[in-house]
């Protein structure tokens, strides 16, 4: 029976920058996952002696794979060819060369297995590695056939593995929830949500992940030299694409628009999550109680709340946290550890990010601009809250009275009116508060601390919000207009109180005589009548 040898040459073929930019964030993550997972399969087949391709190294570092695209395909050197010929591996006749990208070869190995991978059952599979020079390593996939047949092979480009199926076809369906996918690998990753499988574990901290790319991204936290820092606000990211998405928050760029409501987003993934509000899609179901969620993060949080064993509990006070980082930060409250000092005023902080934000008080830096009115902010979150003044958005609803709020903290504070609970006591004077932040603000009265100084008149304040309110006295700014009568106010709280004149709302009710008031201070003054009686 005739013998022939088929040689596969692994060359550095990948996406161009233009092709890479056309992929969505999800498709890029999928590409990373397939590449890294298939490489691990190849190593398990061939042994750890296999040298790592450049594209795998780049993906592990969070860099873009198009950075190593080569326009020209490399050729076998005569020296290598003679070496292989001397071993009887490369006969002059019946030798066929097929050029594949690294990840297509790996992908076919994973899908079909090593014995019949790529060409079928008639071929024996062997892997040879040879180094042409000190800069580049090739993988030789040499397969001998005993049938004398020329292999049947239809070449596909790398992009074809990730192209959408015709007419939006999604042939791969999840047996648990019915969700369908265009690519089989997407289904494999999705099924791990239902099974809870997290096969990729970090050797540094033991944290486990469903996808190999997520582990690689996480490991950069331990390797500080592979982190990406924003030059504007010093925020740290483990992936360059995350940094680029974040940088849009400084310039206000939001290129992804929702066709239903017109809301715009910085990142395509945020738009995809938002669209589920309109479609009502909740693809992530809890196997314990059947409750469904729009985001997998919400499901994970829900499952941790139901499973006491998965919580991280403080041994000092018993408070539980959903993640270990939250517990570590909380533990510093008990130890008093504040390792990050401000060089200007000496104030210390538990978290480095708190120091970065605090330093902007001294520098006056406000990197976040409102495109509507030009107002600037030191924090991106403050800009988001401010923009809701222009849009009128109030996403947080009280289930008791159907009142809406711009901030979640405002909702929580408001709900305390209904339940009357004040769990946070001041050890100095015994005064109780509904919110821990209110207690913290109150305690600065006893300490006499006033870290926020007005640059105009040198007056100091306990709270940043007090300084912001005060500064409007110097500028004369009154940004809050009443839509009923046109009256303008310096403070948003003043506008809210004023609007109750038009609406007739009196939310503060006396528990003794049921009399209602527009302002809380009016209720407090009234309650003294009953105490004097």
Curated annotation (Swiss-Prot):
InterPro entries to which the protein is assigned, alphabetical:
KRAB, KRAB_dom_sf, Znf_C2H2_sf, Znf_C2H2_type
Q: Looking at the UniProt record for this protein, which Gene Ontology cellular component terms does it annotate, in alphabetical order?
A: nucleus
Q: Glycyl lysine isopeptide (Lys-Gly) (interchain with G-Cter in SUMO2) cross-link located where?
A: 155
In residue numbers, the zinc fingers (C2H2-type) are 172-194, 200-222, 228-250, 256-278, 284-306, 312-334, 340-362, 368-390, 396-418, 424-446, 452-474, 480-502, 508-530
Q: What is its main location?
A: nucleus
Q: Which GO terms describe its biological process?
A: regulation of DNA-templated transcription
Q: Where in the cell is it found?
A: Nucleus
The residue ranges of the KRAB domain are 6-78
**Keyword terms of this UniProt record:** DNA-binding, Isopeptide bond, Metal-binding, Methylation, Nucleus, Repeat, Transcription, Transcription regulation, Ubl conjugation, Zinc, Zinc-finger
* Residue numbers carrying Asymmetric dimethylarginine: 75
UniProt cross-references to Pfam families, sorted A to Z: KRAB, zf-C2H2
User: Which domain of life does this protein belong to?
Assistant: Eukaryota
Task: Write down the Gene3D superfamilies for this protein, in alphabetical order.
Answer: 6.10.140.140, Classic Zinc Finger
Note the SUPFAM superfamilies from the entry.
beta-beta-alpha zinc fingers, KRAB domain (Kruppel-associated box)
A GO molecular function assigned to this protein is: zinc ion binding
Family (UniProt): Belongs to the krueppel C2H2-type zinc-finger protein family.
Q: What does this protein do?
A: May be involved in transcriptional regulation.
Q: What is this protein called?
A: Zinc finger protein 30
Provenance organism:
Mus musculus
């Amino acid at each position: 029976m005739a013998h022939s040898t088929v040689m596969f040459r692994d060359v550095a073929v990948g996406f161009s920058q233009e092709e890479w930019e056309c992929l969505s964030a999800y498709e890029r993550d999928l590409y990373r996952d397939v590449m890294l997972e298939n490489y691990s399969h190849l190593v398990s087949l061939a042994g750890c002696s296999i040298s790592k391709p450049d594209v795998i190294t780049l993906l592990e570092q969070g860099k873009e794979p198009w950075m190593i695209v080569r326009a020209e395909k490399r050729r076998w050197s005569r020296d290598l060819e003679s070496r292989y010929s001397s071993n009887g591996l490369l006969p002059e006749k019946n030798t066929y060369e097929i050029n594949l990208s690294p990840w297509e070869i790996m992908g076919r190995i994973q899908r079909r297995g090593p014995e019949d991978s790529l060409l079928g059952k008639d071929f024996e599979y062997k892997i040879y590695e040879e180094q042409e020079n000190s800069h580049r390593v090739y993988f030789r996939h040499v397969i001998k056939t005993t049938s004398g047949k020329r292999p049947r092979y239809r070449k596909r480009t790398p992009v074809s593995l990730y192209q959408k199926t015709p007419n939006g076809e999604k042939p791969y369906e999840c047996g648990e929830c019915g969700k369908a996918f265009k690519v089989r690998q997407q289904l494999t990753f999705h099924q791990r949500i239902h099974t809870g499988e997290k096969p990729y574990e970090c050797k540094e901290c033991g944290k486990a992940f469903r996808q190999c790319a997520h582990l690689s991204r996480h490991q950069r936290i331990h390797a500080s030299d592979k982190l990406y820092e924003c030059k504007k606000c010093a925020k740290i990211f483990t992936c360059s694409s995350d940094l680029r998405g974040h940088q849009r928050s400084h310039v206000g760029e939001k290129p992804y628009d929702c066709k239903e409501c017109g809301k715009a987003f910085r990142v395509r993934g945020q738009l995809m999550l938002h669209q589920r509000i309109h479609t009502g899609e909740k693809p992530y179901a809890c196997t314990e109680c059947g409750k469904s969620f729009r985001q997998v993060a919400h499901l994970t949080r829900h499952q941790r709340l139901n499973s006491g064993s998965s919580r991280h509990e403080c041994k000092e006070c018993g408070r539980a946290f959903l993640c270990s980082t939250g517990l570590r930060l909380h533990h510093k409250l008990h130890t008093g550890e504040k390792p990050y000092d401000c060089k200007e005023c000496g104030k210390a902080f538990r978290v480095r990010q708190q120091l970065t934000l605090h330093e902007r008080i001294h520098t006056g830096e406000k990197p976040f601009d409102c495109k509507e009115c030009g107002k600037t902010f030191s924090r991106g979150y403050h800009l988001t809250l401010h923009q809701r003044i222009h849009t009128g958005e109030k996403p947080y609803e009280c289930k008791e009275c159907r009142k809406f709020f711009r901030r979640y903290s405002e909702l929580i504070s408001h709900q305390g009116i209904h339940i009357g609970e004040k769990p946070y006591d001041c050890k100095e004077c015994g005064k109780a508060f509904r919110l821990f932040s209110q207690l913290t603000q109150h305690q600065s009265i006893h300490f006499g601390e006033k870290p926020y100084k007005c640059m105009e008149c040198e007056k100091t304040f306990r709270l940043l919000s007090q300084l912001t309110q005060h500064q409007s006295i110097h500028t004369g700014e009154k940004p809050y207009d009443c839509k009923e009568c046109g009256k303008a106010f310096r403070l948003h709280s003043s506008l809210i109180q004023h609007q109750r004149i038009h609406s007739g709302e009196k939310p503060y009710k006396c528990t003794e005589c049921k009399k209602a008031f527009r302002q809380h201070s009016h209720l407090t003054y009234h309650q003294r009548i009953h105490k004097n009686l």
